[in-house]
């Protein structure tokens, strides 16, 4: 089950001594992706295919910033709708970070023999325009 696999992955990351910031980023990314999967009735890690990854990227692009919360009941409300950037486009850098975090999870799943291959393809990352770089 995806949710249990994520918990096992997080435990493995903790045993490896990954930084707290990295752990938080992984967990948040994988929870948000888990919500996306649950909305589509996907509960098993082995059910996830490349078209799900593409659909998730499209969904992230369309929904905008802060429109989904990784935690169902936050400890304290932070009123994301009050932010000036609420609903604005999610940057390619952020989407690439999500993909990198998801790729780490799926690579772990392959090593643990939970899945046969990583559903994220190398060309899924988005080309990022660099600001202020002069050739």
Predicted regions and their residues:
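Onset of an N-terminal alpha helix
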Residues: 2-6
């Amino acid at each position: 089950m995806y949710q249990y696999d994520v918990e096992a992955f997080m435990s493995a990351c903790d045993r490896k001594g990954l930084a707290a910031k990295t752990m938080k980023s992984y967990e948040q990314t994988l929870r948000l992706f888990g919500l996306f999967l649950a909305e589509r009735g996907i509960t098993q890690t082995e059910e996830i295919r490349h078209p799900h990854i593409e659909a998730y990227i499209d969904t992230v692009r369309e929904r905008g910033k802060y429109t989904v919360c990784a935690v169902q009941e936050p400890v304290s409300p932070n009123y994301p709708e009050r932010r000036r950037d609420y609903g604005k486009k999610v940057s390619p850098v952020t989407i690439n970070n999500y993909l990198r975090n998801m790729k780490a999870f799926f690579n772990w799943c392959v090593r643990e023999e939970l899945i046969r291959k990583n559903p994220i393809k190398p060309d899924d990352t988005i080309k990022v325009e660099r600001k202020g770089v002069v050739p």
